[in-house]
Amino acid sequence: KFPITRPPLRNHGNYVVSLNKLVKWLGGLVEQEGINLFTQFAGAQLIYEGEGIAGVITEDKGLDKDGKPKDNFTPGYELRAKVTVLAEGPCGSLTKDLVSRRKLDNLNPQVYGIGIKELWEVPAGRMQPGFTAHTLGWPLDSSMYGGGWVYGLRENRVSLGMVVSLEYHNPLFDPHEAFQKYKTHPYVKRILEGGKLVRYGAKTVPYGGWYSMPRTYVDGGLIIGDSASFLNSQRLKGIHMAIKSGMLAAETILEALRTGDASARTLSAFPKKVEDSWIKKELWEVRNFHQGYEHGLYAGLF
């Protein structure tokens, strides 16, 4: 255990929340304002017009395993909008297609990590709600960039996981296997012993930061959140920036609707708003953090 907690990892006064519950709560607020949410429909392709986008087409329903229509086939819906906001996460298919078609990735290529997470229910009294621990090292070797966490939630639940950058050199390394080893560490094992797994998941993480941001606007479209590389790789936190970038996008869209102009010229106000907000300050301070670990763990620490 380190004798001191480094400032970026100090979480006193913060909240440990379920992102799933937070999103559901926000969705309820949105629906109270008369806005429709289509949570069962995935976007299959963007509607391209000119140099920009004009909406999205949802995926077809009622297809068999070979992709052929069944009796209950329903074609995807064409949803048009004056401004379409892409918030698909770091590897969204629509965002990647837009960035490629419109050549929006004019900076460094994005680099990724993979995060594996589990939610456990443990015996009563073992974990204090709000407890946070960040781990470094084993089972990752010193050449790898990554680490783990243990968070205490309410109702005797524990969130734990591990993230590792995908630049590791060993082709036989298995992140999922490494996470299973992680749970055998005496510290983690004591927490989980006698508990049960409730759910699990995995996601990619955009490590590129400020220098890997794509252009975030086109005619009729904006890119926010992880899709825009808004993640602090030092603190491994991005939800707050996803929410803030969504708020800034809303301000930009409101101005576009008021003027009746949703062109790239008007929507270019969005990255300016990002630069004037605390998002720029936070990302700029850690712009070289990941690169500092290019030669391994110990070089990065010092």
Placement of each model-derived feature along the sequence:
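A conserved beta-strand/loop capping segment in the N-terminal third of enzymes
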Residues: 1-12
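Active-site-proximal substrate-binding core of FAD-dependent oxidoreductases
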Residues: 229-235, 247-300
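Alpha-helix capping and helix-loop boundary segments enriched in small/acidic/polar residues
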Residues: 107, 170-173, 212-215, 233-241, ...
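Predominantly flavin-linked oxidoreductase catalytic cores and closely associated redox partners
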Residues: 20, 24-25, 29-193, 229, ...
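Flexible, glycine/charged-enriched surface loops at secondary-structure junctions
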Residues: 190-201, 260-267
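FAD-binding beta-loop-beta segment adjacent to the flavin cofactor pocket
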Residues: 202-233
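N-terminal FAD cofactor-binding segment of flavoenzymes
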Residues: 1, 94, 102, 277, ...
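Alpha-helix N-cap/helix-initiation motif
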Residues: 11-15, 19, 74, 105, ...
